[in-house]
């Protein structure tokens, strides 16, 4: 693992920087973090590597292993990891972040909520992700495309290398990010790596004129490094950790069950008084039986043909699969919605079912808040408060009735906000308040009676 101090020590010239960049990329690709990130993303795509790479083996009489190409080899993969990740992200971030100052989102380009979800989705999958803030834009760097250079003294991120190559026959692109700017590099096929663009500052000021068009006149950098690490919990690990083995066990048992059912669909025939038939004769006999569906048996000589089928035991497998599914959700602190979908469930029962996922969401949202505070520092946002509107399965009518039953104990503004959150319309809070204000003014105007005109007319 190379650090920021290694970079300062080795990258003293342009040539040394290029050598360091190539060495850092190669080491990163061969690191455990990179390999685990690749594996975790395969599980996220429902291409669970343990079962996909499994091959059934037979052993000869001498003990030599050979590949089993005769029996069924189904490979069924579960989708637990994708569901757990998606549930966590959508639960806390699905309705977007709620900023106390509504104008904060205007400081960012594009949909900031979508970008934050992407960053923390990859943080949950791969252990860590990186958010690059630059001039209002927030970009996600994944573990599989970014080499972090950590400071040995304080553990902070001081530099990094982003790299990408769409195909082995295409150029390798790399960008070196430092505190004082970034430099772009390229390595084309059969060519040494070279500088593509010299170091540039992060913040650029442009000037437009009729003669010269738009040109950059000056630039500056941020007070801190503009790439921020993001984690999904204080464990600082992929959410696959701890549940991978259970997912693998589920896949193996389910696939094994499918294989046994496939193999057991065969009908086995017991031939009696046919000891004179060798393997070739038996094969010919079975082929004729399958083709004509008729068999000639000399019963007088004691011959007989009896079919047999195998009943595959399934009760114990079903029980264990159900147990594994429950354990996976419990260990991931996720919500198994099958337990709250049946019947008319009360709000109290729903809240109890959400206990684990609420605890996990508390820890997750702490990481989001820490990340956003660093983003705000770069964006020049001060004293901003963030709240989360969690997406829940609720007994809406019961919750609204509870809010309304408080009477005058709670302010009307608070009750309206809570009801809008339950209805999923929290983003329309200002609009609703404006409508209520307009209606209130209209009613006041209607209640004001015009003054009577008591002026007496003049006599002619």
Residue ranges and their predicted role:
Residues 210-345:
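Extended, charged amphipathic alpha-helical segments
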Residues 82-93, 126-128, 244-259, 266, ...:
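Short, hydrophobic/amphipathic alpha-helical patches that form generic packing surfaces
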């Amino acid at each position: 693992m190379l650090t920021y101090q290694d970079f300062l020590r080795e990258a003293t010239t342009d040539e040394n920087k290029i050598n360091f960049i190539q060495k850092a990329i190669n080491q990163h690709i061969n690191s455990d973090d990179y390999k685990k990130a690749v594996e975790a993303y395969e599980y996220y795509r429902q291409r669970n590597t343990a079962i996909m790479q499994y091959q059934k083996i037979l052993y000869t009489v001498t003990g030599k292993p050979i590949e089993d190409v005769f029996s069924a080899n189904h490979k069924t993969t579960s989708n637990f990891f994708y569901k757990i990740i998606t549930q966590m992200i959508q639960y806390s971030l699905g309705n977007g972040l709620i900023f106390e100052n509504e104008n904060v989102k205007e400081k960012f380009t594009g949909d900031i909520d979508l970008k934050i979800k992407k960053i923390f989705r990859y943080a949950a999958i791969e252990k860590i992700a990186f958010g690059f803030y630059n001039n209002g834009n927030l970009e996600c760097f994944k573990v599989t495309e970014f080499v972090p250079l950590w400071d040995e003294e304080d553990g902070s991120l001081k530099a990094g290398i982003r790299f990408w190559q769409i195909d082995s026959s295409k150029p390798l692109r790399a960008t070196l990010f430092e505190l004082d700017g970034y430099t772009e590099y390229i390595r084309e096929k059969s060519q040494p790596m070279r500088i593509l663009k010299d170091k540039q500052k992060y913040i650029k000021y442009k000037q437009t004129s009729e003669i010269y068009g738009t040109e950059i006149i000056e630039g500056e950098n941020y007070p801190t490094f503009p790439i921020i690490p993001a984690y999904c919990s204080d464990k600082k690990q992929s959410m696959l950790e701890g549940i991978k083995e259970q997912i693998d066990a589920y896949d193996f048992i389910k696939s094994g069950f499918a294989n046994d059912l496939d193999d057991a669909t065969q009908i086995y025939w017991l031939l009696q008084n046919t000891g004179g038939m060798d393997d070739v004769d038996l094969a010919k006999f079975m082929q004729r039986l399958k083709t004509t569906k008729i068999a000639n048996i000399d019963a007088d000589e004691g011959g007989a043909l009896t079919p047999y089928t195998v009943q595959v035991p399934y009760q114990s497998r079903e029980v264990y699969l159900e147990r594994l599914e429950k354990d996976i959700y419990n260990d991931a602190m996720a919500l198994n919605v099958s337990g709250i979908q049946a019947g008319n469930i009360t709000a109290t029962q729903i809240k109890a079912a959400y206990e684990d996922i609420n605890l996990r969401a508390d820890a997750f949202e702490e990481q989001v808040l820490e990340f956003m505070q660093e983003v705000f520092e770069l964006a020049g946002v001060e004293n901003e408060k963030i709240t989360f509107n969690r997406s829940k399965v609720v007994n809406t009518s019961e919750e609204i009735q509870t809010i309304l039953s408080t009477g005058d104990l709670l302010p009307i503004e608070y009750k309206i906000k809570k009801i809008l959150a339950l209805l999923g319309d929290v983003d329309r809070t200002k609009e609703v308040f404006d409508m209520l204000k307009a209606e209130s003014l209209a009613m006041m105007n209607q209640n004001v009676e015009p003054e009577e005109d008591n002026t007496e007319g003049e006599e002619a």
